[in-house]
Regions:
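NAD(P)+-binding Rossmann beta1-loop-alpha1 motif at the extreme N-terminus of oxidoreductases
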Residues: 1-55, 62
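Amphipathic alpha-helical segments at domain termini/boundaries
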Residues: 12, 26, 30, 69-88, ...
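Internal alpha-helical scaffold of NAD(P)-dependent oxidoreductase catalytic cores
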Residues: 31, 135, 156-187, 193-224
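Conserved beta-strand segments of alpha/beta enzyme cores
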Residues: 34, 72-74, 116, 138, ...
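Hydrophobic/aromatic beta-strand patches that form the interior of the parallel beta-sheet core
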Residues: 36, 90, 140-142, 182
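Rossmann-like NAD(P)-binding element
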Residues: 40-47, 58-116, 124-125
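Rossmann-fold NAD(P)-binding glycine/threonine-rich loop
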Residues: 102-153, 158-171
Length: 224
């Protein structure tokens, strides 16, 4: 369990179980959370199990929560069923608008209004992803760096409809489980981390506040 200011997070739904999603699942397990994983691939369950087993030795070296266990997860092929009972949802489906928009629409209908849905997307516009969600205010980008179970940096980006409370909850949750969340200004933009040279040039020309944030990025081990 992770206790935040306003809520407690016990169960996380990880929707999309490729490299990023499976790595997220391992990381959440290492911090004592119950995890439900969903992915449509026929061999997804076995791949997730192998990924968690492979990641666990490194997570042990980094330090496990007292309640951590590599066995506290279950698999549901249907994303709506996987989301049932979740206190936080981390979506990591393929980077295609048609896939993510439909998936997020389904998750938005399945989850209670107060549950934050964070997308791992790095290159899609958050405001476009929100277009078909009834509760768009609870949708945010929570973009990890690869692999998420090792690299601590997470970029948090809100869309035009994202509520401030959603940003606060996502930032607090990531921080509580050992991540280093960095917030980008709410906009229709994508994340900046994978485009460091272009982003740094722009950030440094935009004023002192952005310069300070930009300097923090390399400290969290930007990948090549």
């Amino acid at each position: 369990m992770v206790k935040l200011t306003e809520i407690e997070i016990r169960r996380v739904a990880v929707i999309g179980a490729g490299t990023i999603g499976a790595s997220w699942a391992a990381y959440f397990l290492a911090h004592g959370l119950d995890v439900t994983v969903s992915d449509p691939a026929p061999d997804a369950r076995d791949k997730v199990a192998r990924h968690i087993d492979g990641a666990w030795p490194a997570l042990e070296k980094l330090g496990l929560a007292p309640e951590a266990s590599p066995d506290r997860w279950r698999f549901q092929a249907d994303p709506s069923a996987a989301a049932d009972g979740a206190d936080f949802c981390q979506e990591s489906a393929p980077e295609r608008y048609e896939i993510k928009i439909e998936l997020l629409r389904r998750l938005d209908r399945a989850l209670p209004r107060e549950v934050v849905i964070a997308s791992s997307s790095s290159g899609l516009l958050i405001s476009r992803l929100q277009e078909h969600c009834n509760y768009a205010e609870r949708l945010v980008i929570g973009h990890p760096f690869n692999p998420p179970h090792i690299v601590p940096l997470v970029e948090v980006v809100g869309g035009f409809k994202t509520a401030q409370a959603t940003i606060v909850t996502a930032m607090e949750f990531y921080r509580a489980i050992g991540k280093h969340p960095r917030r980008d200004a709410p906009s229709g933009s994508t994340t900046v981390g994978w485009r460091p040279l272009r982003a740094w040039c722009w950030q440094f020309s935009a004023g002192s506040d952005r310069r300070r944030r930009c300097r923090r990025l390399p400290r969290c081990r930007l990948p090549p």
